[in-house]
C-alpha cells in the first residue's frame, strides 16, 4: 500500500510540473506576440507586478533594468518602436523549459531605421506566482550597434 501511495504522489508531482512547464512555454510564446501587437498592454496581464526586463549586451541600450511600467510605457514604444518603426516578425525556432523558466530561441526579420535588421535572439523568461517575473533578452549586440545605431567597426592595428 505504501508503494502505491508513493507512486501516486510521484505521478501527481510529475503531472503538475509537466503542466506548469507547458503553461510557462505557452505564456512565453504568447508574450512577445501580444507585446509587439497593436495593443501591447494585453501582454502586461501576463507579467508579475514586480516584473523586470533587461536587454543584455554592450550597447547604449543594454543592461538597464526596466520595471513593468517602464517596459510597456518606454521600452516598447520609445526604444523598439523608434528603432524598428515598421515592426518585427519573430519566429520561434526552439524552446528549452523547466518549471521555473523558459528560454525561447527566435529569429527576427525587420526593417530598422537604417535598413535591413535580421537578428537572432534568446529570451530567458523566469516565472513567479504563475506570471512572467523577468525577461533577459540576448542577441547580437554587434548587429544592434552597426545596423540600428550606425556604429562602425574599427580595425585595431597591432
Language-model regions: role of each:
Residues 110-112, 129:
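Beta-strand elements of well-folded, non-transmembrane domains
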Residues 134-158:
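Low-complexity, intrinsically disordered terminal/linker segments enriched in charged
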Residues 49-98:
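A solvent-exposed, acidic/Ser-Thr-rich amphipathic alpha-helical stretch
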Residues 4, 11-41, 45, 152-158:
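Short, low-complexity N-terminal intrinsically disordered segments enriched in polar/charged residues
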Residues 28, 42-44, 51, 71, ...:
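Hydrophobic pocket/interface hotspot
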Residues 88-90, 116-123:
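Short, surface-exposed coil-to-beta transition loops
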Residues 99-108:
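A short hydrophobic beta-strand element
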